[in-house]
Amino acid sequence: MAHDEQLWLTPRLQKAAALCNQTPAASDTPLWLGVDLGTCDVVSMVVDGNAQPVAVCLDWADVVRDGIVWDFFGAVTLVRRHLDTLEQQLGCRFTHAATSFPPGTDPRISINVLESAGLEVSHVLDEPTAVADLLALDNAGVVDIGGGTTGIAIVKQGKVTYSADEATGGHHISLTLAGNRRIPLEEAEQYKRSNAQEIWPVVKPVYEKMAEIVARHIEGQGIADLWLAGGSCMQPGVEALFRQRFPELQVHLPQHSLFMTPLAIANSGRAKAEGLYAS
């Protein structure tokens, strides 16, 4: 049975947002760590036995491009820094962590980073599958719009029956904005985060293209619900655009969707590797 969006998912995402780079929450249960290596950010999240976020570290970073870790040393350094911070804050030691990868790419890419940071990988799965598992979906589609890629998964009877990855995401939105404003790409990334309402007319065509890509992948799949995840979905206007494009579907865009994939990854470790938790 799918988790209730308002009663189960939304409070956890709100808690993750509130904990981001802040003092951890208290918990008296075992803890599990998940690491999300994104194109625009690296997020490490700790959850407890109730699937509640306990601690969140986030760094905006350009270490992954198109599903490839192009700055391996930078990625390892960030994960190691997150690990040191979390262990110091929580007073425990993490030996294992879960992670993910974009559909169609080599999972060893993410695994190698975590192992080089001193962690054993307890569980690895593709990003939209992680979200589908977190939400316990059935007869639904998951669209994870990240920084560099858009992952798509179809879930039937609790199992992922189809997944794909397209090379379009927040990075392409920044490129469009940089060209329109005639500013450097790094400046466009910052401008995008602080002027979301203002930039919608400029970036809307990019999201329209994403919606058409999604339409191609879900055509004929017979799904009833479409779930949106990923930091790039937090742009105002995205939910309305997808609702307009897919009027026959129930479109869901939870608050703080940036943290949905990290929450899903951490909980995949909790669900699949119950004996491997912080000591």
Curated annotation (Swiss-Prot):
<comment type="similarity">
    <text>Belongs to the EutJ family.</text>
</comment>
<dbReference type="Pfam" id="PF14450">
    <property type="entry name" value="FtsA"/>
</dbReference>
<comment type="pathway">
    <text>Amine and polyamine degradation; ethanolamine degradation.</text>
</comment>
<keyword id="KW-0143">Chaperone</keyword>
<dbReference type="InterPro" id="IPR050696">
    <property type="entry name" value="FtsA/MreB"/>
</dbReference>
<dbReference type="InterPro" id="IPR043129">
    <property type="entry name" value="ATPase_NBD"/>
</dbReference>
<comment type="function">
    <text>May protect ethanolamine ammonia-lyase (EAL, eutB-eutC) from inhibition, may function in assembling the bacterial microcompartment and/or in refolding EAL, suggesting it may have chaperone activity. Overexpression of eutJ and eutS in E.coli leads to multiple BMC-like structures; eutS expression alone leads to 1 BMC-like structure per cell.</text>
</comment>
<comment type="function">
    <text>Expression of the eut operon allows this bacteria to use ethanolamine (EA) as a carbon, nitrogen and energy source. It relies on cobalamin (vitamin B12) both as a cofactor for the ethanolamine ammonia-lyase (EAL) activity and to induce the operon. EA enhances bacterial survival in macrophages in a concentration-dependent manner, suggesting it is an important nutrient during infection.</text>
</comment>
<protein>
    <recommendedName>
        <fullName>Ethanolamine utilization protein EutJ</fullName>
    </recommendedName>
</protein>
<dbReference type="GO" id="GO:0046336">
    <property type="term" value="P:ethanolamine catabolic process"/>
</dbReference>
<dbReference type="InterPro" id="IPR013366">
    <property type="entry name" value="EutJ"/>
</dbReference>
